[in-house]
C-alpha cells in the first residue's frame, strides 16, 4: 500500500472515467485529439477503456467471483480483472486479481484531514487531491438523470465536496457537458438561482482561466457563447434542461472569440 503521494503525479492532467452516460464525452474528447497524462477508470470501465493507467474498484472483488451482486457486470469483470496490468485500488487484496493494491486510506485521510468518502468515484477524486494533480477532467460521474426524476444514485454530494477541495488546492476541474455534476448540463442562463428568473439573467463563465460575471445579453453581443468538450463539432444539437426540467435545444454553438 502507498504510504506517500506519487511524486510523478504532481501537476499532471488526469481523466477520471466512470460508468454514467457522460462517459460518451470522454470518447468524443479522444476523438477530437484531447490528451491526458493519465486516465483513471471506475469499476466496469476497466473493461471498456483500453490500457488505463489506474483503476478504482473499492468493493471487494470477491463479489464478482462469488456472487451475482454486480448484475450484468459480473461476467465481464470476472473475465477482465485477472488480466489487468495497471494498479487497481481497492479495500481488500485477492489472489485472483494480481493487479490489486490497497487504497492508501490511512495516509490519505490524515493528509487531507477528511474521512467523508462514500462512493468509488469520490475515492478516485480524493486520490487525485492527495497526489496534488494539476487538472481533473470528470466523465461518466452522473448520479441523476432528467429522464427519471424519481431515481438518484448516492454519492453526488460527496464527489462535489471533494472536487471543491481540489479546487481550493489549485487543481483545475472540468466536467463533461452531459453530466449533472456541478450542474454542468444546466443551461448557462439557469445556473445562478434567482437570477435565472430575470429577463436578462446574470451568468458566470470561465474565460482565459478567470471567472467572468456579466449579463447574458453581454455574451450574445460579444458572440461569446461558451461551449464544452463534446458536441462542438456534432451535427446533432445537445438537449439541455432548465430548472423546471423542460428540455430546450441549444442553438448551434460558436467558437469563443475575444472582443
Model-assigned labels for residue ranges:
Residues 1-259:
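Metal-ion/cofactor- or nucleotide/acyl-coenzyme-handling active-site neighborhoods
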